[in-house]
Swiss-Prot record:
Keyword Kinase in record: no
Chain positions with Leucine amide modification: 16
GO biological process, one term: defense response to bacterium
Protein name: Citropin-1.1
Subcellular location: Secreted
Summary of the function given for this chain in its UniProt record: Bacteriostatic action for Gram-positive bacteria. Strongly inhibits the formation of NO by neuronal nitric oxide synthase (nNOS) at micromolar concentrations. Acts by a non-competitive mechanism, probably by binding to calcium/calmodulin and as a consequence blocking calmodulin attachment to nNOS.
Gene Ontology CC: extracellular region
InterPro entries with a match to the protein in the record: Aurein_antimicrobial_peptide
């Protein structure tokens, strides 16, 4: 769902 996308984006940002 949308929340899963948000979590994924947050994970990518955290990886930076």
């Amino acid at each position: 769902g949308l929340f899963d996308v948000i979590k994924k984006v947050a994970s990518v940002i955290g990886g930076l």
